[in-house]
């Protein structure tokens, strides 16, 4: 049996993702996203999906629409 759940990142991977989300950048550019994915041992697609979902969760917690764009878009 695999230690990694089929439906999401492991606790260690989430710790890496959360650190980068909270301390580094909520909107990583493609190069940074690639580096975070490599550090966490996830694909770029999985990492991008996680950041998108986490950003929506953060926006809801701040009372913002979950799908609003940044002011730089």
Swiss-Prot record:
**Could you tell me where this protein is found in the cell?**
Nucleus; Cytoplasm
Locate the DNA-binding region by residue range: 3-62
Q: Which domain of life is it from?
A: Eukaryota
GO BP term, example: regulation of transcription by RNA polymerase II
A GO CC annotation recorded here is: cytoplasm
For this protein, the record's Pfam families field holds: Homeodomain (PF00046)
Q: Which UniProt keywords apply?
A: Cytoplasm, Developmental protein, Homeobox, Nucleus, Repressor, Transcription, Transcription regulation
Record bears the keyword Acetylation: no
| Any GO MF annotation of the entry | DNA binding
Q: How does it assemble?
A: Interacts with serum response factor (SRF). Component of a large complex containing histone deacetylases such as HDAC2. Interacts with the acetylated forms of HSPA1A and HSPA1B. Interacts with HSPA8.
What does the UniProt record say this protein does? Atypical homeodomain protein which does not bind DNA and is required to modulate cardiac growth and development. Acts via its interaction with SRF, thereby modulating the expression of SRF-dependent cardiac-specific genes and cardiac development. Prevents SRF-dependent transcription either by inhibiting SRF binding to DNA or by recruiting histone deacetylase (HDAC) proteins that prevent transcription by SRF. Overexpression causes cardiac hypertrophy. Acts as a co-chaperone for HSPA1A and HSPA1B chaperone proteins and assists in chaperone-mediated protein refolding.
Recorded protein name is Homeodomain-only protein
Taxonomy of origin reads:
Eukaryota, Metazoa, Chordata, Craniata, Vertebrata
The primary gene name is HOPX
